[in-house]
Amino acid sequence: MNRRGVLGLAAGALAGLLGRRPVASAAVLRPPGALPPGAFERACIGCFRCAEVCPTRAIRFPGGAGLDAGHPFLALREAACVLCMACTEVCPTGALAPIPAQPERVAAEVRIGVPVLDRRSCLSWTGEGVCSLCAYVCPMGSRAVELVGPQQAPLFHAEGCVGCGLCEEACPVEAHAIRIVPTGSGTGGLT
């Protein structure tokens, strides 16, 4: 084998090792009760128990190797979190801290992500219709979203939102006028 072949094998082996190392990723939405990035990846053993008990199948695991291989994430556009907290009850390592499924505890302790509203796509904000589905499905009510003006346009309050994604899942706009982004991503708010 020549020098180039040896270097290629070494680079591939190193990439494989790095792909399996727990690396913090703040770019994905984690299930409720998730420890902070870094601590979560070190604690999670990828046992799939959280995904198995998720009634909506919102908890997914990425395939293959890479930064988030073996660590659960939420696919809220496809299925929202109904805040049942079953995932936090079955986590054997504490990567998902137990949170009782009591509304006041959920409101105080769960921060999956923050809402971002694209007013250019929202039916109520563009004047193309009165929708308001996001407000009707929100379990946090006016703490997280209120309806304003004659078009009953949604106005989101990140501090009152738990990031469950029910609004994102319910949005009838093809491009989804509302989406939940990871907390601390610096993109919460309006566009």
Please place each PLM-identified region on the residue numbering.
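Non-ligating segments of multi-cofactor redox enzymes
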Residues: 1-191
